[in-house]
Amino acid sequence: VGLDIGSRSVKVAEITETKNGRKLKRFGMADIPPGAIEDGAISDPETVSQIIRQLLKSANIKETNVALSIGGYSVIIKKINVQTMPEAQLQETIHFEAEQYIPFDISDVNLDFQILGENENNPNQMSVFLVAAKKEMVNDYINLVTLAGLTPCIIDVEAFALQNIFEANYDIQDENVALIDIGASKTSLNILKGSSSVFMRDVALGCLQINQKIMSLLDCSYEQAELLKFGEASDKMSAEELKQIVAAVVTDWCTEIRRALDFFYTNYPDDQIKRIILSGGGANLAEFRQL
Protein backbone atom coordinates (compact mmCIF):
# COMPACT_ATOMS: atom_id res chain seq x y z
CA VAL A 1 0.00 0.00 0.00
CA GLY A 2 1.34 3.41 -0.96
CA LEU A 3 0.41 6.45 1.14
CA ASP A 4 0.90 9.97 -0.24
CA ILE A 5 0.50 12.63 2.46
CA GLY A 6 0.42 16.14 1.01
CA SER A 7 -0.28 19.55 2.52
CA ARG A 8 -3.91 19.57 1.30
CA SER A 9 -4.81 15.94 0.64
CA VAL A 10 -3.89 12.35 1.38
CA LYS A 11 -3.99 9.60 -1.24
CA VAL A 12 -3.79 5.84 -0.79
CA ALA A 13 -3.26 3.13 -3.40
CA GLU A 14 -3.18 -0.64 -3.02
CA ILE A 15 -1.13 -2.45 -5.65
CA THR A 16 -1.11 -6.20 -6.30
CA GLU A 17 1.31 -8.32 -8.31
CA THR A 18 -0.31 -10.40 -11.06
CA LYS A 19 1.08 -12.62 -13.81
CA ASN A 20 0.58 -9.66 -16.16
CA GLY A 21 2.41 -7.22 -13.90
CA ARG A 22 1.32 -4.78 -11.22
CA LYS A 23 -2.36 -3.90 -10.93
CA LEU A 24 -4.08 -1.06 -9.09
CA LYS A 25 -6.52 -2.81 -6.77
CA ARG A 26 -7.94 0.06 -4.72
CA PHE A 27 -7.49 3.83 -4.54
CA GLY A 28 -8.81 6.60 -2.30
CA MET A 29 -8.29 10.31 -1.67
CA ALA A 30 -9.35 12.70 1.10
CA ASP A 31 -8.82 16.39 1.87
CA ILE A 32 -6.69 17.63 4.76
CA PRO A 33 -7.77 20.85 6.52
CA PRO A 34 -5.55 23.93 6.04
CA GLY A 35 -2.72 24.17 8.56
CA ALA A 36 -2.65 20.48 9.53
CA ILE A 37 0.50 19.99 7.42
CA GLU A 38 2.68 22.91 6.30
CA ASP A 39 5.80 22.43 4.16
CA GLY A 40 5.94 18.80 5.18
CA ALA A 41 5.75 19.54 8.92
CA ILE A 42 2.82 17.88 10.72
CA SER A 43 1.11 20.23 13.18
CA ASP A 44 -2.10 18.24 13.81
CA PRO A 45 -1.27 14.50 13.78
CA GLU A 46 -4.50 13.48 15.51
CA THR A 47 -6.70 15.01 12.82
CA VAL A 48 -4.59 13.72 9.93
CA SER A 49 -4.34 10.19 11.38
CA GLN A 50 -8.12 10.09 11.76
CA ILE A 51 -8.53 11.17 8.13
CA ILE A 52 -6.17 8.37 7.06
CA ARG A 53 -8.15 5.82 9.11
CA GLN A 54 -11.42 6.92 7.50
CA LEU A 55 -9.85 6.91 4.04
CA LEU A 56 -8.59 3.34 4.40
CA LYS A 57 -12.01 2.27 5.65
CA SER A 58 -13.88 3.93 2.79
CA ALA A 59 -11.44 2.47 0.24
CA ASN A 60 -11.82 -0.97 1.88
CA ILE A 61 -8.05 -1.33 2.32
CA LYS A 62 -7.16 -3.74 5.12
CA GLU A 63 -3.41 -4.08 4.51
CA THR A 64 -1.49 -2.20 7.23
CA ASN A 65 2.07 -2.22 5.82
CA VAL A 66 2.59 1.03 3.93
CA ALA A 67 5.22 2.86 1.90
CA LEU A 68 5.28 6.64 2.20
CA SER A 69 7.46 9.56 1.19
CA ILE A 70 8.58 12.83 2.76
CA GLY A 71 9.57 16.21 1.38
CA GLY A 72 9.77 19.88 2.27
CA TYR A 73 12.68 21.93 3.54
CA SER A 74 13.62 19.36 6.19
CA VAL A 75 14.83 17.13 3.35
CA ILE A 76 18.04 17.99 1.51
CA ILE A 77 19.08 16.36 -1.77
CA LYS A 78 22.50 17.32 -3.04
CA LYS A 79 24.69 16.04 -5.87
CA ILE A 80 28.31 16.01 -4.68
CA ASN A 81 31.66 14.81 -5.98
CA VAL A 82 33.96 12.73 -3.77
CA GLN A 83 37.19 10.82 -4.20
CA THR A 84 36.56 7.48 -5.90
CA MET A 85 36.24 4.75 -3.28
CA PRO A 86 34.33 1.51 -2.66
CA GLU A 87 30.74 1.89 -1.48
CA ALA A 88 31.56 0.32 1.89
CA GLN A 89 34.26 2.93 2.50
CA LEU A 90 31.92 5.77 1.51
CA GLN A 91 29.37 4.38 3.97
CA GLU A 92 31.95 4.94 6.71
CA THR A 93 32.94 8.47 5.62
CA ILE A 94 29.62 9.87 4.38
CA HIS A 95 28.94 11.76 7.63
CA PHE A 96 32.22 13.65 7.25
CA GLU A 97 31.49 14.42 3.59
CA ALA A 98 27.92 15.50 4.39
CA GLU A 99 28.94 18.07 7.01
CA GLN A 100 30.18 20.33 4.21
CA TYR A 101 26.80 20.40 2.47
CA ILE A 102 24.04 19.91 5.04
CA PRO A 103 22.77 23.09 6.81
CA PHE A 104 21.67 21.08 9.88
CA ASP A 105 23.57 19.52 12.74
CA ILE A 106 24.72 16.22 11.26
CA SER A 107 23.61 14.35 14.39
CA ASP A 108 20.03 15.56 13.79
CA VAL A 109 19.60 13.97 10.35
CA ASN A 110 19.24 10.56 8.75
CA LEU A 111 21.69 10.21 5.86
CA ASP A 112 21.65 8.07 2.73
CA PHE A 113 23.44 8.19 -0.60
CA GLN A 114 23.47 6.78 -4.11
CA ILE A 115 26.61 6.50 -6.23
CA LEU A 116 25.86 7.83 -9.72
CA GLY A 117 29.16 6.91 -11.38
CA GLU A 118 32.40 8.53 -12.46
CA ASN A 119 32.61 12.32 -12.45
CA GLU A 120 32.62 13.35 -16.11
CA ASN A 121 35.18 16.11 -15.43
CA ASN A 122 37.52 14.21 -13.11
CA PRO A 123 38.19 10.46 -13.48
CA ASN A 124 39.57 10.34 -9.91
CA GLN A 125 36.20 11.37 -8.48
CA MET A 126 32.70 9.93 -8.49
CA SER A 127 29.35 11.70 -8.40
CA VAL A 128 27.08 10.89 -5.48
CA PHE A 129 23.51 11.84 -4.59
CA LEU A 130 23.45 12.78 -0.92
CA VAL A 131 20.09 12.70 0.87
CA ALA A 132 19.52 14.03 4.38
CA ALA A 133 16.24 14.15 6.29
CA LYS A 134 15.76 15.58 9.75
CA LYS A 135 15.22 12.78 12.25
CA GLU A 136 12.46 14.78 13.91
CA MET A 137 10.49 14.92 10.66
CA VAL A 138 10.99 11.22 9.92
CA ASN A 139 9.84 10.35 13.45
CA ASP A 140 6.79 12.62 13.07
CA TYR A 141 5.68 10.68 9.98
CA ILE A 142 6.34 7.33 11.65
CA ASN A 143 4.23 8.45 14.62
CA LEU A 144 1.48 9.73 12.30
CA VAL A 145 1.02 6.48 10.38
CA THR A 146 1.33 4.49 13.62
CA LEU A 147 -1.50 6.61 15.08
CA ALA A 148 -3.53 5.64 12.01
CA GLY A 149 -2.98 1.96 12.83
CA LEU A 150 -0.39 1.39 10.08
CA THR A 151 3.18 0.09 9.92
CA PRO A 152 5.65 2.14 7.85
CA CYS A 153 7.85 -0.25 5.83
CA ILE A 154 9.42 2.23 3.41
CA ILE A 155 10.07 5.96 3.82
CA ASP A 156 11.30 7.47 0.56
CA VAL A 157 11.93 11.01 -0.66
CA GLU A 158 9.04 12.41 -2.72
CA ALA A 159 11.14 13.15 -5.80
CA PHE A 160 12.61 9.64 -5.88
CA ALA A 161 9.22 8.02 -5.27
CA LEU A 162 7.80 9.85 -8.30
CA GLN A 163 10.85 8.84 -10.34
CA ASN A 164 10.32 5.19 -9.38
CA ILE A 165 6.68 5.37 -10.52
CA PHE A 166 7.74 6.88 -13.83
CA GLU A 167 10.45 4.28 -14.46
CA ALA A 168 8.08 1.43 -13.55
CA ASN A 169 5.56 2.57 -16.16
CA TYR A 170 7.63 3.99 -19.02
CA ASP A 171 10.59 2.38 -20.78
CA ILE A 172 12.55 5.48 -21.77
CA GLN A 173 16.26 4.71 -21.50
CA ASP A 174 18.13 7.22 -23.65
CA GLU A 175 15.95 10.34 -23.47
CA ASN A 176 16.34 13.29 -21.15
CA VAL A 177 13.04 13.66 -19.28
CA ALA A 178 11.79 16.39 -16.94
CA LEU A 179 9.40 15.26 -14.20
CA ILE A 180 7.42 18.26 -12.93
CA ASP A 181 5.13 17.80 -9.93
CA ILE A 182 2.83 20.72 -9.04
CA GLY A 183 1.37 20.30 -5.59
CA ALA A 184 -0.60 22.58 -3.30
CA SER A 185 2.35 24.48 -1.83
CA LYS A 186 5.38 23.55 -3.92
CA THR A 187 6.52 22.57 -7.39
CA SER A 188 9.28 19.98 -7.82
CA LEU A 189 11.49 19.48 -10.87
CA ASN A 190 13.54 16.32 -11.43
CA ILE A 191 15.53 15.91 -14.65
CA LEU A 192 16.54 12.40 -15.68
CA LYS A 193 19.29 11.35 -18.08
CA GLY A 194 18.28 7.80 -18.84
CA SER A 195 17.57 6.26 -15.45
CA SER A 196 19.77 8.69 -13.48
CA SER A 197 18.55 11.87 -11.84
CA VAL A 198 20.98 14.69 -12.64
CA PHE A 199 19.15 17.79 -11.43
CA MET A 200 16.50 18.54 -8.80
CA ARG A 201 14.90 21.73 -7.61
CA ASP A 202 11.89 22.70 -5.46
CA VAL A 203 10.18 26.08 -5.66
CA ALA A 204 7.61 27.35 -3.14
CA LEU A 205 4.84 27.80 -5.71
CA GLY A 206 1.70 25.72 -6.12
CA CYS A 207 -2.06 25.48 -6.54
CA LEU A 208 -2.65 27.10 -3.16
CA GLN A 209 -1.69 30.45 -4.72
CA ILE A 210 -4.69 30.30 -7.04
CA ASN A 211 -7.06 29.43 -4.21
CA GLN A 212 -5.72 32.26 -2.06
CA LYS A 213 -6.26 34.81 -4.84
CA ILE A 214 -9.83 33.63 -5.42
CA MET A 215 -10.55 33.58 -1.66
CA SER A 216 -9.20 37.12 -1.31
CA LEU A 217 -11.23 38.51 -4.21
CA LEU A 218 -14.51 36.74 -3.44
CA ASP A 219 -14.24 36.34 0.34
CA CYS A 220 -15.09 32.65 -0.03
CA SER A 221 -13.93 29.41 1.58
CA TYR A 222 -11.02 27.28 0.42
CA GLU A 223 -13.42 24.58 -0.77
CA GLN A 224 -15.40 27.08 -2.87
CA ALA A 225 -12.18 28.44 -4.35
CA GLU A 226 -11.10 24.90 -5.25
CA LEU A 227 -14.32 24.33 -7.21
CA LEU A 228 -14.01 27.67 -8.99
CA LYS A 229 -10.39 26.97 -9.90
CA PHE A 230 -11.44 23.97 -11.96
CA GLY A 231 -14.23 25.78 -13.77
CA GLU A 232 -17.39 25.74 -11.64
CA ALA A 233 -19.66 28.67 -12.57
CA SER A 234 -20.01 31.63 -10.19
CA ASP A 235 -22.20 34.71 -10.22
CA LYS A 236 -19.43 36.62 -8.41
CA MET A 237 -16.74 36.12 -11.03
CA SER A 238 -16.88 35.73 -14.79
CA ALA A 239 -15.15 32.86 -16.54
CA GLU A 240 -12.77 35.34 -18.16
CA GLU A 241 -11.79 36.87 -14.79
CA LEU A 242 -11.11 33.43 -13.37
CA LYS A 243 -9.05 32.51 -16.41
CA GLN A 244 -6.91 35.63 -15.91
CA ILE A 245 -6.26 34.76 -12.25
CA VAL A 246 -5.22 31.22 -13.11
CA ALA A 247 -3.10 32.39 -16.04
CA ALA A 248 -1.22 34.93 -13.89
CA VAL A 249 -0.27 32.33 -11.28
CA VAL A 250 0.57 29.69 -13.86
CA THR A 251 2.85 32.18 -15.63
CA ASP A 252 4.80 32.53 -12.37
CA TRP A 253 5.16 28.75 -12.19
CA CYS A 254 6.45 28.60 -15.76
CA THR A 255 8.94 31.41 -15.12
CA GLU A 256 10.46 29.51 -12.19
CA ILE A 257 10.48 26.24 -14.15
CA ARG A 258 12.24 27.94 -17.07
CA ARG A 259 14.86 29.34 -14.68
CA ALA A 260 15.52 25.85 -13.37
CA LEU A 261 15.73 24.47 -16.91
CA ASP A 262 18.14 27.27 -17.90
CA PHE A 263 20.35 26.27 -14.96
CA PHE A 264 20.29 22.68 -16.22
CA TYR A 265 21.20 23.72 -19.76
CA THR A 266 24.07 25.84 -18.41
CA ASN A 267 25.52 22.78 -16.69
CA TYR A 268 24.64 20.36 -19.51
CA PRO A 269 24.93 22.49 -22.69
CA ASP A 270 24.97 19.48 -25.03
CA ASP A 271 21.77 17.95 -23.66
CA GLN A 272 18.18 18.61 -24.69
CA ILE A 273 15.08 17.64 -22.71
CA LYS A 274 12.96 15.50 -25.02
CA ARG A 275 9.91 14.98 -22.86
CA ILE A 276 8.11 16.66 -19.94
CA ILE A 277 5.90 14.60 -17.61
CA LEU A 278 3.44 16.52 -15.43
CA SER A 279 1.93 15.31 -12.16
CA GLY A 280 0.18 16.75 -9.11
CA GLY A 281 -3.00 18.80 -8.90
CA GLY A 282 -1.61 21.58 -11.09
CA ALA A 283 -1.31 19.18 -14.02
CA ASN A 284 -5.13 19.25 -14.25
CA LEU A 285 -5.09 22.95 -15.18
CA ALA A 286 -5.40 23.40 -18.95
CA GLU A 287 -3.75 26.84 -18.71
CA PHE A 288 -0.60 25.26 -17.29
CA ARG A 289 -0.44 22.43 -19.82
CA GLN A 290 -0.74 24.93 -22.66
CA LEU A 291 2.13 27.09 -21.40
Residue ranges and their predicted role:
Residues 1-31, 50, 65-69, 168-199, ...:
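Gly/Thr-rich phosphate-binding beta-strand-loop-beta motif of the actin/hexokinase/Hsp70
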